[in-house]
Curated annotation (Swiss-Prot):
Cofactors, names only: Mg(2+); Zn(2+)
UniProt remark on cofactor binding: Binds 1 Mg(2+) ion per subunit.
Species this protein is from: Mycobacterium avium (strain 104)
Residues reported in the UniProt entry to bind Zn(2+) 1: C60, C62, C75, C78
Name used for this protein in its record: DNA-directed RNA polymerase subunit beta'
Similarity remark: Belongs to the RNA polymerase beta' chain family.
Transmembrane segments: none
GO CC annotations on file: DNA-directed RNA polymerase complex
NCBIfam families tied to this protein: PRK14906.1 (NF011498), rpoC_TIGR (TIGR02386)
GO molecular function ontology, one term from the record: magnesium ion binding
């Protein structure tokens, strides 16, 4: 087999019969598979050892040669080569066909490639191939022309003869009639009898005339057909064809079936045809030109690729190796076989029968029928079911043909090439491991032993516990005591990868250092659950083992969980306290009025109470039980930095230094909390709501190295769990309090509802108005019950604590639990006007329960649909962006996009832009940011982090120009400077980073949170699409539902208000032609927007509009935006629209991810005029290629091609990629492969997918060429230290991160002192 690292591109083409025979090791002549008695392959059959190789290593069929020493000998008795049995996976055979057949892909695909090449309609082609019509393959024009007059004379003679015969017959009959009539006259017969005789005579004469006329017409038809005879002409009438052959056989040749197609292709002159088509395209119009363009695509493909079109008609069929279509014996003595064997058997049977019929000289009709059946059997083998009814096996199941083996999720591409299974892996249920450090996981001993088996065995031999590998293996299998010690040693410093399906983004696989644990469950650190989206209700996770040194290094440096604290989508920390931890820290930092040991100032006769000289003293007081951690005290601090304002006041310009004392009015809990934060972090004197905790960790991630952040979140986790236990927050029925005012509130609203009902019955309201009124009333009622609930609950109620701390849940859930459920929706998504008045605490009535089930069931169905849709969206996004990789440091472009930082109010104050986090943050500045005085605040090329943005806002700068991937000029991929900071690391993105895939994951991962439904927006007639369908609509560049017109020009609006429609006319400012939009439905309503005077109101007559402005409510069509405003605007429009959907759901994704995808959608140019280039008009060309080709042509003095940018949906863009491997593994596999083969496409292997498919390292990350060539050798010290168990003291974590024991630590054993 050839090594994947020795080639740089992969080409696909058409195989000729010669190629097929060259690959083959012999011809398969018999349909037999294996002998049912001996179970050995039959000679010359589909499993023949002589052709495909021996079934057993180094052993021939007859058993004469058995052993390696005869390697390479071909046995003279049975003809089998002595070699490995594995060659049966790679040796092919072939079947020599008795008659040529066409390849169904090229004839039946849409468009029919054969039809386009030969200029035959697919229907006609089918008639020819399946023996329903003859086709003329060649005509000897010259000979026909020369002898036409002679032939015409002959024809005239023949016609004359027919006419003469007719006249003679008529004459004779007329005379007979006369005689008969005379005879009757003489006999005196009645007039009646005479009339009968006359009628019959005349009828016979009419018949004679008709017969002669038919004969003359036939001759006329034959003659006309012959004079107009041309190649590729179809003759469906068999008699006519026979006559032509009998009379003029030497002037033309004709045939039916694939043979005729083969002859036509042989006589086909590709170059002349291409020239003629180009001529038609230059001068033609309309349909003719379109047809010529389509045909030229196929003809030019053959012309340029040098493929021979003869490859579309096969003289021999290859037989794939037998191990790839195996036959296995089942226990019952029956055999299971691959469908391909059945399909091959049909081909061989029919082929052999055809050979026999031809040898016997059977009549043509029988031979043709057999040829047709052979054609059909080869079609079924290549693509069963493509034409006619599929061939079925037992139980009416269609057989799987070669095409079916490639297609779809279960096909070769997606199942075996992109989704390989890997060795050294295991999976188990996960449980929480609160005692672990952030970079650790608990690995069950048995699983670890199995995973690390080879390492353990080698180490046992090294340490002389075992003599050889075999005995070491036995020791491991019997689990001898010394095995465990060796295992401890082997796993030290060897990271493992944990993965939880579905892996929606890159944090779904992270590396951890394993700790051996008892039991069979993997222990997972609680802080990484967010990234994995894991919980402990029975989730399972898979473990994988990186083997090579490089793999271990990558796992440790790039994938260790403590290095992956930030989300790649938004750049904000994911590893932060949640659930119990939040509650614990919230409890710890709460200040309770009048709690034990509270600070009281000195009075006349009492000293000051609650003042402490140090945190240690306060802890001592707490330990003695005289001070509560939540009581307000005064404490003197020396090791904690005061907040900024106090620091400025107390310590002035020099600032605080460790050891400087200051007094804090706070609680002991808050002091303990602040001691967890890194040294030098300003004191936080607040109650720790989840949001505050998040902002602190955010801040840490911006200011401190990752390792400090990892230590801090770990300390917060420990403290959180400890204090959550201490707080005693539990939920019981007694905690669910129903507000006493509930009944009176509901009675009040019931009265209002009664009134509305009465009005409805009197006819004052119609049905819809009544429903709307009731919905309003009950919404108010629900809110009021919620309000009463809020007031009734005490502050220390556990349920309220959980909600208020931000740990989980929200107030709506509390209201449902204890107040009332409120309004629910029906299956259509409308509110049912009767509310559910009960809370879950009181219990629902039967009717309430029933109406509540609608919404609940719809929710479940919706979630299932959403998950599938969202997964498919992610798959398309990955496919379109998979080859976007950071290729260089800086493309040096001057271009960029302008982002808003703030809005200036009329009074001159700045209001920070709410979306600054996802637009300007983490970008590279494109030009110097200068304030009014001309001072450079931030220089070009700087990274915009939080401090820089604050500096810009302080200087009063409202917008800046930043670099963006939309304007990057790198050819393939993007440059690091245009991309900016990598969200996951907080530093400039590395070269080799696969930013395309990260972008696709960042957009796809929250896809499941988006809603499915389209929602009504304030009485707009058309639904406005939102949620996931809207995101798909945007990325697929579809014309939106409820499309809104946009202004083509800048000018004044003239609005005409009709009965059902608006008509808008724009009078352009530059005096060009007016633009008219009529028939604008009134249901869509006019757009509200900001006017020049700053007011917001609906578009009205006389308003001034800018180019590209939307005129009606709804969504603009991106293709229109592209046409009117150009590529840059449409990119920004798409980014903005996608962000709106995600923001509505509260999902934070950085703009740069969406920009990467949108950039891929606008990569191509459609050619309008080809100039002197090779491009065909109407074809889609990559922009970089288009510009390069134009530069080349202009340099040579030719005409450049003209093109216009085109917006492609992501599916279309994926299929239009230059890599045929990537496109074929995405969708429409057979179509892509057909196309690629005709064009002789070459895959440069630039993207990730194609390299995964052929098994090379991907050209991203450490697989990119500039890193691949680095050589690494371990030093002697490293070799020596390879097996000593290190402690974490000296390297990874600070001293208070001791070695974890792997045993669960009872929380009660923790003293307070651990929190210092």
């Amino acid at each position: 087999m050839l090594d994947v690292n020795f080639f740089d591109e992969l080409r696909i083409g058409l195989a000729t019969a010669e190629d097929i025979r060259q690959w083959s090791y012999g011809e398969v002549k018999k349909p037999e598979t294996i002998n049912y008695r001996t179970l050995k392959p039959e000679k010359d059959g589909l499993f023949c050892e002589k052709i495909f190789g021996p079934t057993r290593d180094w052993e021939c069929y007859c058993g004469k040669y058995k052993r390696v020493r005869f390697k390479g000998i071909i046995c003279e008795r049975c003809g089998v080569e002595v070699t490995r049995a594995k060659v049966r996976r790679e040796r092919m055979g072939h079947i020599e066909l008795a008659a040529p057949v066409t390849h169904i892909w090229y004839f039946k695909g849409v468009p029919s490639r054969l039809g386009y090449l030969l200029d035959l309609a697919p229907k006609d082609l089918e008639k020819i191939i399946y023996f329903a019509a003859y086709v003329i393959t060649s005509v000897d024009e010259e000979m026909r022309h020369n002898e036409l007059s002679t032939l015409e004379a002959e024809m005239m003679v023949e016609r004359k003869a027919v006419e003469d015969q007719r006249d003679a017959d008529l004459e004779a009959r007329a005379q007979k009639l006369e005689a008969d009539l005379a005879e009757l006259e003489a006999e005196g017969a009645k007039a009646d009898a005479r009339r009968k005789v006359r009628d019959s005579g005349e009828r016979e004469m009419r018949q004679i005339r008709d017969r002669a006329q038919r004969e003359l017409d036939r001759l006329e038809d034959i003659w006309n057909t012959f004079t107009k005879l041309a190649p590729k002409q179809l003759i469906v009438d068999e008699n006519l064809y026979r006559e032509l052959v009998d009379r003029y056989g030497e002037y033309f040749t004709g045939a039916m079936g694939a043979e005729s197609i083969q002859k036509l292709i042989e006589n086909f002159d590709i170059d002349a045809e291409a020239e003629q088509l180009r001529d038609v395209i230059r001068n033609g119009k309309g349909q003719k030109k379109l047809r010529a363009l389509k045909r030229l695509k196929v003809v030019a493909a053959f012309q340029q690729s040098g493929n021979s079109p003869m490859g579309m008609v096969l003289d021999a069929v290859p037989v794939i190796p037998p191990e790839l279509r195996p036959m296995v014996q089942l226990d019952g003595g029956r055999f299971a076989t691959s469908d391909l064997n059945d399909l091959y058997r049909r081909v061989i049977n029919r082929n052999n029968r055809l050979k026999r019929l031809i040898d016997l000289g059977a009549p043509e009709i029988i031979v043709n029928n057999e040829k047709r059946m052979l054609q059909e059997s080869v079609d079924a083998l290549f693509d069963n079911g493509r034409r006619g009814r599929p061939v079925t096996g037992p139980g009416n199941r269609p057989l799987k043909s070669l095409s079916d083996l490639l297609k779809g999720k279960q096909g070769r591409f997606r199942q075996n090439l992109l989704g390989k299974r890997v060795d050294y892996s295991g999976r188990s249920v996960i449980v929480v491991g609160p005692q672990l450090k952030l970079h650790q996981c608990g690995l069950p001993k048995l699983m670890a032993l199995e995973l690390f088996k080879p390492f353990v065995m080698k180490r046992l031999v090294d340490l002389n516990h075992a003599q050889n590998i075999k005995s070491a293996k036995r020791m491991v299998e019997r689990q001898r005591p010394q095995v465990w010690d060796v295992l401890e040693e082997v796993i030290a410093e060897h990271p493992v990868l944990l993965n939880r399906a579905p892996t929606l983004h890159r944090l779904g696989i992270q590396a951890f250092e394993p700790m051996l644990v008892e039991g069979k469950a993997i222990q997972l650190h609680p802080l990484v659950c967010e990234a994995f989206n894991a919980d402990f209700d029975g989730d399972q996770m898979a473990v994988h083992l990186p083997l090579s040194a490089e793999a271990q290094a990558e796992a440790r440096i790039l994938m260790l969980s403590s290095n992956n604290i930030l989300s790649p989508a938004s750049g904000r920390p994911l590893a932060m306290p949640r659930l119990d931890m939040v509650t614990g820290l919230y409890y710890l930092t709460t200040e309770v009025e009048g709690d034990k040991g509270e600070y009281r100032p000195a009075a006349k006769d009492t000293p000051e109470v609650g003042v402490y000289s140090s945190p240690a003293e306060a802890i001592m007081a707490a330990d003695r039980g005289v001070l509560s951690v939540r009581a307000k005290i005064k404490v003197r601090l020396t090791q904690l930095r005061p907040p900024a304002e106090i620091e400025a006041e107390l310590f002035g310009a020099n600032g605080w230094q460790p050891g400087d004392a200051w007094m804090a009015e706070t609680t002991l809990g808050r002091v303990l909390f602040n001691e967890l934060l890194p040294v030098g972090y300003p004191f936080v004197n607040k109650q720790m709501h989840k949001k505050v905790q998040a902002s602190i960790i955010n801040d840490l991630a911006e200011r401190y190295p990752m390792i400090v952040v990892a230590q801090t979140v770990d300390k917060l986790k420990d403290a959180g769990f400890y204090w959550a236990t201490r707080s005693g927050v539990t939920v019981s029925m007694a905690d669910v309090l129903v507000p006493p005012r509930k009944k009176e509130i509901l009675d009040q609203y019931e009265e209002r509802a009664e009134k509305v009902e009465k009005q409805f019955q009197r006819g004052a309201l119609n049905h819809d108005e009544r429903n709307e009124a009731l919905v309003e009333i009950w919404k108010e009622a629900t809110d009021e019950v919620g309000q009463a609930l809020r007031e009734h609950y005490p502050a220390d109620n556990p349920i309220i604590t959980i909600v208020d701390s931000g740990a989980t849940g929200n107030f709506t859930q509390t209201r449902t639990l204890a107040g009332m459920k409120g309004l629910v929706t029906n299956p259509k998504g409308e509110f049912i006007p009767r509310p559910v008045k009960s809370s879950f605490r009181e219990g629902l009535t039967v009717l309430e329960y029933f109406i509540n089930t609608h919404g609940a069931r719809k929710g479940l169905a919706d979630t299932a649909l959403r998950t599938a849709d969202s997964g498919y969206l992610t798959r398309r996004l990955v496919d379109v962006s998979q080859d976007v990789i950071v290729r260089e440091h800086d493309c040096e472009t001057e271009r960029g996009i302008v982002v808003e930082l703030a809005e200036r109010q009329p009074d001159g104050t700045l209001i920070r832009d709410p979306y600054i986090e996802t637009s300007a943050y983490a970008r590279t500045l494109g030009t110097d940011a200068v304030d009014e005085a001309g001072n450079v605040i931030v220089a070009r090329g700087e990274d915009l982090g939080d401090p820089e943005i604050d500096a810009l806002l302080a200087a009063g700068i409202t917008s800046v120009k930043v670099r963006s991937v939309l304007t990057c000029t790198t050819g393939t991929g993007v440059c690091a400077t245009c991309y900016g900071r990598s969200m996951a690391t907080g530093k400039l993105v590395d070269i080799g980073e696969a930013v395309g895939i990260v972008a696709a994951q960042s957009i796809g991962e929250p896809g499941t949170q988006l809603t499915m439904r389209t929602f009504h927006q304030g009485g707009v007639g058309e639904d406005i699409t939102g949620g996931l369908p809207r995101v798909q609509e945007l990325f697929e560049a579809r014309i939106p539902r409820g499309k809104a017109p946009i202004a083509d020009v800048t000018g004044r609006v003239r609005l005409e208000d009709g009965e059902r429609f608006y008509k808008i006319t724009i009078v352009p400012d530059d005096g060009s032609e007016e633009v008219v939009y009529d028939k604008l439905s009134k249901r869509q309503r006019l757009r509200v927007f900001k006017h020049e005077d700053g007011s917001e109101r609906v578009l009205s007559d006389g308003d001034h509009v800018e180019v590209g402005q939307q005129l009606m409510e709804g969504s603009a069509d991106p293709h229109e935006v592209l046409r009117v405003q150009g590529p840059r605007e449409v990119q920004i429009h798409l980014v903005r629209e996608v962000q709106e959907v995600y923001r509505a759901q509260g999902v934070s994704i950085h703009d740069k991810h969406i920009e990467v995808i949108v950039r891929q959608m606008l990569r191509r140019v459609t050619i309008i005029d080809s100039g002197s280039t090779e491009f065909l008009p109407g074809s889609l060309i990559d922009r970089a290629e288009f510009e390069a080709e134009n530069r080349r042509v202009v340099a040579e003095g030719g005409e450049p091609a003209a093109g216009r940018p085109v917006l492609m949906g992501i599916t279309k863009a994926s299929l239009a990629t230059d890599s045929w491997l990537s496109a074929a593994s995405f969708q429409e596999t057979t179509r892509v492969l057909t196309d690629a083969a005709i064009n002789c496409r070459s895959d440069k292997l630039n993207g990730l997918k194609e390299n995964v498919i052929i098994g090379k390292l991907i050209p991203a990350g450490t697989g990119i060429n500039r890193y691949r060539n680095i050589q690494v050798q371990p030093t002697e010290e490293a070799r020596a230290a390879a097996y000593t168990i290190p402690s974490y003291e000296d390297q990874y974590y600070s001293p208070d991160f001791g070695q974890a024991t792997g045993a669960a630590v009872p929380l009660d054993d923790y003293g307070y002192s651990d929190y210092r």
